[in-house]
Each structure stands twice: as structure tokens, then as C-alpha cells.
Design a protein with these regions (language model features):
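Membrane-anchoring alpha-helices and their flanking helix-loop junctions
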Residues: 1-170
């Protein structure tokens, strides 16, 4: 269980850093600033600008649906915790190594995408001509040359590792 907790902490730090560098957090939390992604959603789906619709969406999707998902996602961790008296085995070591590899792969993919998007928008803001991947609008180098969604694949495999931890400990 301690091993799993360490890996979850590493993964959580990575997720927090990735969100923070995109200005996902503000030290002025009392101003009630919202996640930048909601602004984009409201622009694309204008009905969400109606206060009662947004409140219902907030209640049903953000509060209820997402909390339900979090509960379901945590079930493998609960199963692993219930089997916490079992000693660390070779399968735990392999699962841990695999999970670290997927966390690192996800970090590399996110860094590549972040650097690409930052450079692309700097070029656009400076009225530069876009060429290559920037003209296409998406990255095709690094991990992105192997897969269109290396960060998503890594994220899904991290969740598979949680499941494997639950099997290993029970």
C-alpha cells in the first residue's frame, strides 16, 4: 500500500504541475476564477451561458458524475488496501516499474505538446508564417510520431496498473 501511495503521489505531482503551468491555478482563489476550459466550452456551447443551465450542468456533471467516476476509479485502490497484509511480491515490483514508465512517458508527451503549443502560439502572436507541424496544427515528432495520443495512452495504462495492483494484493 505504501508503494502504491508513493506512485500515486508522484503521479499527482505530475498532474498538478502540468495543470499549473497552463495557468490552471490562481493564488487569488477568492476571486472565483474558473478553469480556462469552461470559458472555451461556454463559447462553443452558448446555452451554458444561461445561469440556470450552467448551474444544472455544474450539479449534474461536475458534482455528481465526476464524483461518481472518482469513486469508481478508486475501487481498485480500495481492493489493494483490503489486501494490504500481503507482502510485496515480484508482480508489485513489475507493476511499479511499469507505472513509473507510464508516468514518465505521459510527462514527456505532455512536455512535447506544451512546448509545441507554446511555440505555435508565439509564432501566431508574432505574425510569423507557420510551417511544418505548426501549419498542420498538430505535433508529429517525438512520441507524437508513434501515436496521436501518447499522453492519453499512458494515462489509461496508469489506470490499468491500479487494477493490476488490486489483483496482485488480493
Amino acid at each position: 500500500m505504501v508503494l502504491m501511495s508513493i506512485l500515486v503521489t508522484i503521479w499527482g505531482i505530475r498532474l498538478t504541475y502540468n495543470f499549473a503551468r497552463k495557468s490552471g491555478y490562481s493564488i487569488y482563489f477568492w476571486r472565483g476564477e474558473e478553469d480556462y476550459r469552461w470559458k472555451i466550452l461556454k463559447e462553443r456551447v452558448p446555452v451554458f451561458n444561461i445561469k440556470i443551465i450552467w448551474s444544472l450542468f455544474n450539479l449534474l456533471f461536475i458534482c455528481t458524475y465526476q464524483m461518481g467516476l472518482i469513486f469508481l476509479f478508486s475501487l481498485p485502490i480500495l481492493a489493494a488496501w483490503q489486501g494490504q497484509n500481503s507482502p510485496i511480491g515480484i508482480s508489485d515490483v513489475f507493476i511499479s516499474i511499469a507505472m513509473l514508465i507510464f508516468i514518465i512517458t505521459e510527462s514527456i508527451a505532455d512536455n512535447q505538446q506544451y512546448n509545441f503549443q507554446t511555440t505555435k502560439y508565439n509564432l501566431i502572436n508574432n505574425n510569423k508564417t507557420l510551417t511544418g507541424d505548426f501549419k498542420k496544427g498538430f505535433l508529429t515528432k517525438g512520441l507524437w510520431s508513434i501515436s496521436r495520443h501518447p499522453n492519453f495512452i499512458s494515462e489509461q495504462l496508469i489506470w490499468v496498473m491500479f487494477y493490476l495492483f488490486s489483483i496482485s494484493s488480493t
